[in-house]
């Protein structure tokens, strides 16, 4: 690859990154726990039909993460991080509590 081609390719990548939307900024989830006896943890949420793709059922005390005001809540279903298997999903907002307890 010639040097001029490398420079052009680098400039194209830099230009694409400069025009990318900053709305996808990563916010670290605030430590919390599941405060319900059990809580369904779903893969995703659809505004028309609600949550779908049951991943697992969380027990009381499972370590989760959610940052109020930064992570979305749709009709009571909150985007939540499950620190056990380290993945994102949706659970009921009223089952998230004990913030900063661990």
Which residues fall in each region the model found?
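N-terminal prepro-regions of secreted/extracellular proteins
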Residues: 1-32
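Short, functionally important structural connectors and interaction interfaces within domains
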Residues: 9-11, 50, 83
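General "foldedness" signal
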Residues: 15-17, 21-22, 55, 61, ...
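Beta-loop motif signature
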Residues: 29-75
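Secreted/processed peptides and extracellular or luminal domains of membrane proteins
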Residues: 42, 101-102
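SH3/SH3-like beta-barrel superfamily modules
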Residues: 58-101
């Amino acid at each position: 690859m010639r040097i001029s081609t490398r420079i052009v390719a680098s400039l194209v990548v830099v230009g694409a990154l400069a025009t990318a939307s900053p709305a996808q900024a990563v916010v670290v989830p605030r430590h919390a726990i599941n405060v319900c006896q059990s809580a369904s943890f779903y893969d995703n949420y659809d505004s028309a039909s609600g949550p779908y793709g049951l991943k697992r059922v969380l027990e009381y005390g499972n370590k989760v993460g959610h940052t109020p005001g930064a992570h979305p809540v749709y009709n009571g279903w909150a985007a939540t991080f499950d620190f056990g298997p380290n993945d994102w999903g949706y659970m009921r907002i009223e089952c998230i509590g004990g913030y900063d307890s661990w």
